[in-house]
Structures are given as C-alpha cells and as structure tokens.
C-alpha cells in the first residue's frame, strides 16, 4: 500500500515537472480571461450626467465614477426608484445610455434569454393568456399614452409637427385606405389584429367597405362594438374574437374571398415559427390579385435569427426587381457591430417580455428581409416597402411626453412600479428607433394568381 502511494506520488511529480509550464500558462490565461470579463469600461459621460440619482443613493461611487455600470444594476435601480432618467418626458432619456451602461453579454443575460425562450411556447392557450394579461394591466395606461383609440399606428410627420400626433395619425390612416389598400365599396376587407377596432371602424365608415375585424379580448370587443354603433357602421362591420388562428372564421362557406387584408403589428406576438402558417392562412382567404398590407417591427438583419447579406435603405422603395438603386449593403447606418450593441438588443427584448408585453418576441428574431421572404414563399408578391423608423422614433417621443404628463394618474391606478417600467420601456424604444437598432416598416404585397 505504501509502495503504491509512493509510486503515484512519483508519477505525479514527474508529470508536474514535465508539464508545469503548460499548467502555469493555462492558469494565467484563465485568470486574465476572468479579469477581462470583470474589467471596467471607461464612460465618456459620468452616470450622473444622464441619471438623476435619488438622495438615498447619491452621492455614490457607482453613480459618480466614470466607469460604466452594469445593465442589471441600472434596470434594478431604476425599477426600484433609486435613479431617474433625465429628459424622460422628451423620449431622449436613453439617448446616451450606451455611454454609461455596459451591455455586455454574460451568464445573467444568457440565463434570462434561455428562460424567455423556454417559457414562450406560443400555444393558443398561452397566447390568449398573454394578450389578456397585457390588455388588462395596460388598458388605462394605453388610453393615456396612445389616446382613446389605443391605436399603435406610426404617425406620418412629413407635413405635421411632432406635437400634432392626432393629425399625423389621421393622415396615415387616409394613406392606408387610399394609397396602400385602394379601398372602394366593392372590396371585402379583413383586419387582422384589429386591437380596439378603431382603424377598422374608420375604414368601414369612410370607404363603405364590408369588413371583418379580429379582436383578441372581450374588453376590446366591447369597445369596438360600441364604437361601431356610434359610427353607424354595423351593416358594414362585424367582429370575430381570437388571434391569427381565427382568420378562416372570418370567411364562412359560400362567401367570396377577401380582396384586401390589413395587419397592423399582427406579427409581434405570433412567434417567428408561426409566421409561415399565418401568411398561408391569409393567402387562402384572399382572391388572386388582392392586396395585403402589414405594419411590422423588426430587427436589423445583422442581429436577426438568420442574418442576411443585404438590407434595404431609404425612406420608401419599390422592390419590384433587384436594382442596385433600390438595395444597399449592410453598413448604410443599420449594421450593428460590437458586443455591447448586440447584447443591448437582447437586454431590451428581455425587458419588454418580462415587464411590458409577454410573448412579444417576434421582432427580437426576425428582420424585414425575412418577412418579405416569407411573404414570397406564402404566395405573395411584395410590391412596396416603406421605412417608418424615423416616424416611429417621433411617435414614441410623443408617447413618452404623454406618459410623463399622466404620471400621477397612472401611479394611482397601476402603481409606481408599472409607471417606471413603461417610462424605461418607451424611452428605450425611442432610443433604438432613433439609432436604427429597431425598425418599423409598411409592407404591401399582392397575392399571386
């Protein structure tokens, strides 16, 4: 027994003498890698230039140093009221956030992404539960921020000042009816994801077009039904309760197919893997040559689930054909580079699903190029795309202003935690739109014969 131990000790000593250089080098590399992940980034601004720390935490080494703070600490401190954003009312509260907050990819983010994917299955039951939770908890807040119609439509600010959001929305709705859908009384319109029904009521009233609108919850149905009664469009408009799976219910047997279909932000909550099935179901209820219009929120192609080589640029483009004048390589302001830019994308979408809208994960994984590719595969020909990213930034800034103006009422109805979560969410969203790291588009497609 003693001899065996002596032999093992001798062998271990021999191995150590032979490989001690490699072992020491490995330990040094591991130590360097660990220290590198814990390094502090130099911040161009002091955090106190962007945050307004509360008296209980300021002065503090964390908020007065010129080293970046972690995004986990920032989100936690903000939601607990320890800090506030400067210029939050203007929507520019997160304009320089990347200068003072470190959006590095770490195990915390990896775990949160994993939990998000594991908890989001997009079954019919879970999708219904998520949208009911979102509508129930956010209804009164959305009325204060988006207006009584709660329409998440991007304004058209070519001829309007930002403060006149209602006027820009009216112009946008008119453009949808005339320029995009070209509606007339002989058409048959399907409105998927009709929200609270206001856009469907407007189109049915102004264009006298028979319309079927899909709303998600009973509260939305009650609002839409009352609005249609006030507008006296019941003979043109009917509502169906459900989600994208209810598309076929809007076309009973014996009725002619729809000539026009509208989907405002319908892709947001259906899940990336369900997009092909949704587009095929829309194709099945449309007649050949019918128009299909979508408003979509997407991620730059360099951050998408399957990055593409090309990205579209410019405000409004015709994409019939493949002209170099209509296409541009990634790098025209939309290419995302660097670890922190990539990680911020994931932190933002985790925050949105965790605190604002559960299940809204489609824009996290898909780019506008992928949406157009899925449309092509589903039997549509994409004929026009319009970038709304700049208008979306302006619209979101107006929403931020309205949120701050209604702060006291929102805190009384929903609590301070809900208000702070929405303040951070809207300012963060506006910042991503303004920096081209979140995209908004109109897409017009036509069903192929």
Please state what every model-predicted region is.
Residues 289-297:
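Conserved beta-strand signature within the Rossmann-like core of class I S-adenosyl-L-methionine
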Residues 2-168, 182:
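Feature captures hydrophobic
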Residues 298-442, 446-449:
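Substrate-binding/catalytic lobe of Class I Rossmann-like enzymes that use SAM or dcSAM, i.e.
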């Amino acid at each position: 027994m003693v001899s065996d131990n002596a032999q093992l000790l001798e062998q271990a000593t021999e191995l150590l003498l032979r490989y001690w250089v490699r072992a020491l080098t490995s330990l040094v590399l591991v130590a360097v890698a660990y220290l590198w992940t814990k390094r502090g980034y130099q911040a161009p601004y002091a955090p106190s230039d962007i945050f307004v720390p509360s008296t209980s935490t300021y002065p503090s080494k964390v908020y007065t140093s010129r080293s970046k703070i972690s995004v986990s600490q920032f989100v936690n401190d903000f939601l607990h009221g320890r800090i506030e954003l400067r210029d939050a009312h203007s929507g520019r509260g997160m304009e320089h956030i990347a200068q003072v907050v470190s959006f590095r990819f770490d195990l915390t983010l990896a775990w949160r992404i994993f939990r998000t994917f594991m908890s989001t299955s997009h079954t019919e039951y879970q999708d219904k539960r998520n949208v009911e939770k979102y509508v129930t908890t956010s209804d009164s807040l959305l009325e204060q921020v988006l207006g009584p119609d709660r329409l998440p439509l991007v304004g058209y600010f070519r001829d309007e000042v930002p403060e006149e959001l209602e006027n820009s929305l009216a112009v946008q709705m008119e453009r949808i009816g005339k320029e995009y859908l070209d509606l007339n009384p002989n058409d048959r319109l399907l409105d998927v994801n009709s929200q609270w029904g206001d856009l469907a009521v407007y189109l049915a009233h102004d264009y006298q077009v028979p319309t079927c609108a899909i709303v998600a919850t009973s509260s939305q149905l009650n609002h839409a039904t009352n609005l249609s009664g006030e507008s006296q469009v019941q003979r043109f408009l009917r509502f169906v309760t459900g989600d994208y799976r209810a598309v076929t219910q809007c076309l009973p047997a014996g009725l002619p197919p729809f000539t026009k279909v509208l989907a405002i932000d319908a892709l947001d909550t259906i899940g990336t893997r369900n997009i092909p099935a949704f587009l095929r179901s829309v194709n099945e209820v449309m007649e050949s040559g019918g128009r299909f219009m979508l408003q979509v929120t997407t991620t730059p192609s360099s951050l998408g689930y399957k990055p593409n080589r090309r990205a579209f640029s410019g405000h409004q483009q015709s994409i019939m054909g493949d002209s170099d004048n209509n296409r541009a390589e990634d790098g025209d302001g939309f290419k995302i580079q660097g670890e922190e830019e990539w990680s911020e994308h994931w932190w933002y979408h985790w925050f949105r699903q965790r605190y604002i809208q559960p299940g809204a994960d489609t824009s996290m994984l898909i780019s506008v190029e992928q949406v157009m590719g899925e449309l092509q595969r589903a039997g549509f020909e994409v004929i026009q795309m319009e970038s709304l990213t700049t208008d979306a930034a302006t619209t979101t800034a107006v929403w931020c202003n309205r949120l701050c103006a209604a702060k006291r009422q929102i805190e009384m109805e929903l609590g301070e935690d809900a208000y702070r979560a929405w303040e951070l969410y809207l300012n963060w969203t506006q910042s991503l739109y303004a920096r081209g790291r979140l995209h908004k588009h109109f897409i017009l497609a036509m069903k192929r014969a």
